[in-house]
Amino acid sequence: METQITVKVKLKFQSSETAPNFTKTMELYRQACNFVSDYVFNHDFEFKQSHLNKALYADIREKFKLKSQMAQSVIRNVVARYKTVRTQMARKPCRYQDTNTGEWYSESRDLTWLRKPINFNRPQVDLQRGRDWSYRKDGILTINTIHGRAKVVPICHGFNQYFDGTWKFGMAKLLKSGNKWYLHISATKEALDFDKQQVKHVVGIDRGLRFLATTFDEKDKTAFFDGKAVMRKRAKYQKLRAELQSKGTKSAKRRLKKLSGRENRWMTDVNHQLSKTLVDKYGANTLFVLENLDGVSFERTDLPKTLRNQNKSWAFYQLEQFLTYKAHLNNSEVVEVSAQYTSQRCPKCGVIKKDNRNHALHEYHCENCGYTSNDDRIGAMNIQELGKMYISGTERPKFEKLTTNA
């Protein structure tokens, strides 16, 4: 099994010509991406590399002066972006309400829903190891530009640990943030295949807002990771964002862009810390179980207005990504299970009833057997139960609705 991570390296220049060369190369690469994107959009989303090469390669080389490998990279990058958008659209179907009956319906979406080609706004360059970038024995990174290779010094704590022979490097992405330059390098490492027979811990994880995560394990131990501080900070960001949007000035738009980057970096750090805490707590041979949230709506009218936006923008998927790669590096696994009925099912008697959950009190009370507990804990308990079913051999465990035993 391969584990993939992204190594983020800050770059220090040795020549005053490096920054302008990087800037020019990135801008031409961006323009080439938009050129290819227009073609893909207007040709029924053609993704075959051979067809796109035949139609566009010569034009990319001539119009944008990109080297051979960069021209190929442009095509791959555009195709990858469209495929990512296709996946995102499939995960979030269109929901609409029938004005006559009041019932809600879902309709799956695909790329034909796009009204215009995907636009590449941010200048960047995708670089292939060897031909476009390399790391020398003297600690210098060399990066290809339209004016030849540039030499830069990598600044990254623990960067040398990835050169112990166990990691393989692939594509790298050249980026600029403010006045600082970065290289994001894709690295993969072979990890031991996860063995269900060696599992020591099965941990159900319910993700949310009030609690970032609620966990329940095989020892019946529950842990709550408080999200109130995160909610307050996100509400603060939302207030600042609304104030800047109401101004509409150029300076306000610049501040909005910086604010968005700051919020994303902060939230990324929160998810990194939380995923690290979970992996460190349980160690190797742990199965972390998450509910599959594809197509799940988070429209919550019971939340205050200030928190509804947070609910929509919550980075559940990012937390899952971080937890997955950290678990793989620690000989553990993350599995998704069906979210159906996990918040409605009594973990003691198995009866499923929506009204047993009280959102206002954050409580679950089973009318059948009388079991009562925190509603987030109930979710984690049910998710953990599905994890045990997975370990026992059920490939896609889910709950079937039962009526009361009475």
Where are these regions (language model features)?
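Nucleic-acid substrate recognition interfaces
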Residues: 1-406
